[in-house]
Amino acid sequence: MVKVIASSVRKGNVLDVDGKLYVVLTAQNFHPGKGTPVTQVDMRRIVDGTKVSERWRTTEQVERAFVEDLNFQFLYEDGEGFHFMNPENYDQVVVDVETMGDQKAYLQEGMTCVLSIHEGNPLAVELPRHVTLEIVETEPVVKGQTASSSYKPAILSNGIRTMVPPHIDAGIRVVIATEDNSYVERAKN
């Protein structure tokens, strides 16, 4: 276990709080006008999946568990969960639906993800920062809307809704940020 200050805690970190392991879902630092800066952390207990919210002073020490981050390739999904393979030694790991969370919509066959492994168990999955998806449905362009930088709603091939610039139509491939479902750019290929 390594002691770190609360302000350095990030999404995906594994913390040891009172002898129990938690995966950090979100971590935000708040600096109020008056008072001490604090770090608000939402976590999921690894053993039973219970969600917990903690608030620490940014300078407070918390224990980070030793977790190995390894590259794994996504193979397929079945009733058991999401199957990943380590390309170096061909070991396969199954990640359950709860651990995968909402990220499952972005998984594509052959995609390389970073799995956080603690004592042989997958704790968290980190997707690539950007994925390329196709626009399935979007509103048509309205002439004269080019003066403002307005975005229009669009539905991606994985079913997620996002906002895209007016010049993007259905059938076009775009790059999307996996962290917040936002449009990054039009795909190059």
Curated annotation (Swiss-Prot):
It is found in: Cytoplasm. It comes from the Bacteria. It holds the Pfam family Elong-fact-P_C. Keywords: Cytoplasm, Elongation factor, Protein biosynthesis. One of its GO terms (cellular component) is cytoplasm. GO terms for biological process: peptide biosynthetic process. The keyword Cytoplasm applies. Its main location: cytoplasm. InterPro entries: Elong-fact-P_C (IPR015365), NA-bd_OB-fold (IPR012340), Rib_uL2_dom2 (IPR014722), Transl_elong_fac_P/YeiP (IPR020599), Transl_elong_KOW-like (IPR013185), Transl_elong_P/YeiP_cen (IPR001059), Transl_elong_P/YeiP_CS (IPR013852), Transl_elongation_fac_P (IPR011768). PROSITE patterns: EFP (PS01275). GO terms for molecular function: translation elongation factor activity. Pathway: Protein biosynthesis; polypeptide chain elongation. Belongs to the elongation factor P family. Involved in peptide bond synthesis. Stimulates efficient translation and peptide-bond synthesis on native or reconstituted 70S ribosomes in vitro. Probably functions indirectly by altering the affinity of the ribosome for aminoacyl-tRNA, thus increasing their reactivity as acceptors for peptidyl transferase. This is Elongation factor P. It comes from Agrobacterium fabrum (strain C58 / ATCC 33970) (Agrobacterium tumefaciens (strain C58)). The gene is efp.
